[in-house]
Amino acid sequence: MRLLERMRKDWFMVGIVLAIAGAKLEPSIGVNGGPLKPEITVSYIAVATIFFNSGLSLKTEELTSALVHLKLHLFIQIFTLAFFPATIWLFLQLLSITPINEWLLKGLQTVGCMPPPVSSAVILTKAVGGNEAAAIFNSAFGSFLGIVITPLLLLLFLGSSSSVPFTSIFSQLFMTVVVPLIIGQIVRRYIKDWLERKKPPFGAISSSVLLMIIYTTFCDTFSNPNIDLDKFSLVLILFIIFSIQLSFMLLTFIFSTRNNSGFTPADTVAIIFCSTHKSLTLGIPMLKIVFAGHEHLSLISVPLLIYHPAQILLGSVLVPTIKSWMVSRQKGVKLTRPTV
């Protein structure tokens, strides 16, 4: 019974495993030209659905209300979309001499290029009791920035790997990402009261569509006899991903708790999660567009598929530790505050 409850709670993780297993058993269903016609249903309809859904769910009023914390927002966005990918690129120059599968290493670079997620960083920040408004702003604003910056970063670091012309990539991004997102925001203005009252399961809808994208991506992998993923590379990538997450969480903690940083303990909590978390919901569709038709797309996607559950797992484990630190710091501030 407890196992069923756990599976119900983590249904998306179970879904990823089942999607990959299903693709392994019968890859012909989800390949290009197959019964599912992913070149249409996934490349256009599924991706557009995810971003229309994002447009409906993103609360623009919360973006404007949190604008005053400019220093905090700059820190998070620069760390996420500049420092993170640049550091990963330098790290990969060292890893390139190892026997790790080169396409998994390229996949690590794509992780670095991704924007923050819309949900997980906010959920964990709230669980600790950190600056939730800042987390909401940076998750939403980072998603908007990511629509433009992430494809540019992917082309900057991995441009030679993509067989799709630059103009083709951005025209498809515009039609399947920007337009649905804007339409979603416009529709939201007219049905905002209904959305607040009914609270549709936006996360579950996007996650379900995402499972279809993951399934078809791995159908391409398993239908290609030239692709072989060795277990040694996979285990090393798993270790590297957890190491990267821990290192960057520690780094953001050190930077944001310096005496002259100007950040409160609650700000630090938002910084730790928002700066180090990466979006799977936005990332996989973007990889599908930027690397459309690429025979190694699924291998490139593997690190991001690992990073997503890893960041939730690691964040959840660290919630009690970070919370006790934040509470003790806040008590310390109150004790040192002069009484009148």
From Swiss-Prot:
Ranges in the Extracellular compartment?
Answer: 32-37, 93-116, 160-163, 223-234, 292-298
Q: Which Pfam families match?
A: SBF_like (PF13593)
Q: What is the effect of changing residue 130 to R?
A: In SSASKS; uncertain significance
Q: Does the keyword Membrane apply?
A: yes
Record's subcellular location: Cell membrane; Endoplasmic reticulum membrane; Golgi apparatus membrane
- Kindly report every residue range on the membrane side named Cytoplasmic: 1-10, 59-71, 138, 185-201, 256-270, 320-340
Chief location of this protein within or outside the cell: membrane
Q: In which tissues is it expressed?
A: Widely expressed. Expressed at high levels in liver and at lower levels in prostate, placenta, kidney, heart, lung, thymus and spleen. Strongly expressed in testis and also detected in brain, ovary, colon and small intestine. Weakly expressed in testis and not detected in brain, ovary, colon or small intestine. Isoform 1: Expressed in liver, testis and placenta. Isoform 4: Expressed in liver, testis and placenta.
- List the membrane topology term(s): Multi-pass membrane protein
Q: Which domain of life is it from?
A: Eukaryota
Q: What is this protein called?
A: Sodium/bile acid cotransporter 7
Transmembrane regions = 11-31, 38-58, 72-92, 117-137, 139-159, 164-184, 202-222, 235-255, 271-291, 299-319
Coiled coil ranges: none
* Intrachain S-S bonds: none
Q: Which GO terms describe its molecular function?
A: symporter activity
Q: Name one GO cellular component term.
A: endoplasmic reticulum membrane
What is the species of this protein?
Homo sapiens (Human)
According to the entry, the disease involved is: Short stature, amelogenesis imperfecta, and skeletal dysplasia with scoliosis: An autosomal recessive disorder characterized by disproportionate short stature, defective tooth enamel formation, and skeletal dysplasia with severe scoliosis in some patients. Variable features include facial dysmorphism, hearing impairment, and mildly impaired intellectual development.
Q: Name one GO biological process term.
A: sodium ion transport
Q: Which InterPro entries match?
A: Na+/solute_symporter_sf (IPR038770), Put_Na-Bile_cotransptr (IPR016833)
- What outcome is documented for mutating residue 303 to L in this protein? In SSASKS; mild skeletal features; results in altered regulation of calcium homeostasis and abnormal distribution of cellular calcium in patient fibroblasts
Task: List keywords of the entry alphabetically.
Answer: Amelogenesis imperfecta, Cell membrane, Disease variant, Dwarfism, Endoplasmic reticulum, Golgi apparatus, Ion transport, Membrane, Sodium, Sodium transport, Symport, Transmembrane, Transmembrane helix, Transport
What does the UniProt function comment say about this protein? Involved in teeth and skeletal development. Has an essential role in the biosynthesis and trafficking of glycosaminoglycans and glycoproteins, to produce a proper functioning extracellular matrix. Required for extracellular matrix mineralization. Also involved in the regulation of cellular calcium homeostasis. Does not show transport activity towards bile acids or steroid sulfates (including taurocholate, cholate, chenodeoxycholate, estrone-3-sulfate, dehydroepiandrosterone sulfate (DHEAS) and pregnenolone sulfate).
The keyword Transmembrane helix is annotated on this UniProt entry: yes
PANTHER family, A to Z = SODIUM_BILE ACID COTRANSPORTER 7 (PTHR18640:SF5), SOLUTE CARRIER FAMILY 10 MEMBER 7 (PTHR18640)
Q: Which family does it belong to?
A: Belongs to the bile acid:sodium symporter (BASS) (TC 2.A.28) family.
